Amino acid sequence: MKIDNKFPRENARDYALRILKNNILSLELKPGTVISENELATELGISRTPVREAIIELSKAYLIETYPQRGSFISLIDPKMVEEARFIRRITDTAVIELACDEIDEEGLAILEDNVTLQEFYLSKGMTDKIFDLDNQFHKSIYDIAKKDIVYEIHSTLMLHFDRVRNLSVATVKDFKVVADHRNMLEAIRKKDKKTAAELVNKHLNRYQIDEKEIRSQRPEYFKA
């Protein structure tokens, strides 16, 4: 498990929640992995109580499952939840990128350009683990530009399930066409071309639907039946 330092003024519960969630999404903690409050508390250097609170919070998001007498496990990936997350993203991302075409300014373009340029740099250097966070930041920036940041926060919990498949897609299928997708989306926004931008979003999201079949054939143990 990858463990980062606590942020200034970050309480123990939020620290445990952040570390656990990041490791689940990055697949450092693989689906089906048994987790122990005692071991996690020792690794994080905190007491069991904040770890327990973090586990409860992640259980509400269906990322951890706890069973009496059996313990807690990282949830297997649920294809139904992934598809529902993709459904919501298709609707909201399409509407939001069209709004971003109207709202875009030089500052917004600079933010998106810096992000995509970094993605392309890391891809060229084989540092693909760096792309995950930049991917999230890219899409969040589009919501911010469209002035729909609250919408992004509201659906972020369900998106966690989509994000696990997204990260597994890159790790398993080795398909980095998503970086080119981001470049093309940026250029459509720059041109204020709503039709092309919306089409690119749908193509981008459909890419993971195609990948899922390949992923499940290679990692069937990660998925619910």
Task: Show where each model-derived region lies.
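Short linear motifs at protein or domain termini
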Residues: 1-102, 213-225
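Short helix-capping and inter-helix turn/linker motifs at the boundaries of alpha-helical repeat units
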Residues: 11, 109-110, 173-177
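Short helix-capping/hinge motifs at transmembrane helix termini and TM-loop junctions
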Residues: 101-102, 147, 171-172
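Conserved amphipathic alpha-helical segments that form helical-bundle/coiled-coil interaction surfaces
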Residues: 85, 106-167, 180-188, 196-207
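Small-residue-rich midsections of specific transmembrane alpha-helices
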Residues: 67-68, 169, 176
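Short amphipathic alpha-helical interaction/hinge segments
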Residues: 162-173, 209-216, 220
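Anionic, Ser/Thr-rich low-complexity intrinsically disordered regions
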Residues: 25, 138, 158, 175-178, ...
